[in-house]
A protein has these predicted regions:
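Short N-terminal segments immediately surrounding and downstream of signal-peptide cleavage
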Residues: 22-39
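Gram-negative (and chloroplast) outer-membrane scaffold detector with strong preference
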Residues: 27, 55-128, 139-145, 150, ...
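Generic short beta-strand segments
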Residues: 32-36, 73, 163-166
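Surface-exposed strand-loop-strand hairpins of Gram-negative outer-membrane beta-barrel proteins
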Residues: 35-54, 137-138
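Extracellular loop and loop/strand-boundary signature of outer-membrane beta-barrel proteins
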Residues: 39-43, 77-84, 127-134, 168-172
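Subset of outer-membrane beta-barrel
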Residues: 46, 151, 163, 168-172
């Protein structure tokens, strides 16, 4: 299977015209991210978190590239005299299709596959010693979505919005009703 995928990627890269490219070879994005994680605890509860999103996209053809995407989201939940630090990290890779909507705007769509990691948080109970869980949980992550970049200068774009539907599967169960929204700066090389 790995041989087949390698052959497929190499064939596509060789077959596509690389010369008449009006998109940059490399784009690096960094910015703010909001994540709504549904069924976060396996009991149907959701959590709204804030954090960061970073990605790098290598464009090997005019409208086709491959991306590496990383993010971290955080929130302190308080309930019935206790607090819990929620941390959600994702790492994903996959194809990106992009097109110039005009001279000033570029649209893109991607399908990213990778993992999610939720480190153990400490639960602080009023009037009792701190209790920390013994293990973390990790699982499969899939993000499908896209966005719009606005040209600022030759080498800088503003990511107006990136919206993704995210499936995050961990020990807590599959979380299918997740939405992440990002905005920030894109550096083009």
């Amino acid at each position: 299977m790995a041989r087949f995928l390698t052959l497929l990627v190499v064939s596509i890269a060789v077959a596509l015209p690389l010369s008449a490219q009006d998109s940059p070879k490399l784009e690096v994005f960094g910015g703010y991210q909001y994540l709504h994680a549904g069924n976060f605890d396996g009991a149907g509860d959701s959590v709204n978190t804030n954090g960061w999103n970073a990605s790098a996209t290598f464009n090997f053809a005019k409208h086709l590239g491959i991306a590496a995407d990383f993010s971290g989201n955080y929130k302190t939940e308080q309930s019935e005299g206790s607090t819990a630090d929620v941390r959600i990290y994702t790492y994903a890779f996959g194809p990106v299709v992009s097109a110039n909507a005009s001279e000033k705007f570029r649209i893109f769509a991607h399908a990213l596959f990778g993992g999610v990691h939720v480190p153990t948080g400490c639960f602080l109970f009023s009037g009792s010693p701190n209790e920390c869980g013994a293990s973390s949980t990790s699982g499969f992550a899939m993000m499908i979505g896209g966005g719009v970049d606005a040209r600022m200068t030759k080498h800088f774009d503003f990511r107006v919005v990136q919206i993704d539907w995210a499936r995050l599967a961990s020990e807590f169960g599959a979380q299918n009703s997740n939405v992440r929204v990002s905005t920030g700066i894109v550096v083009r090389f």
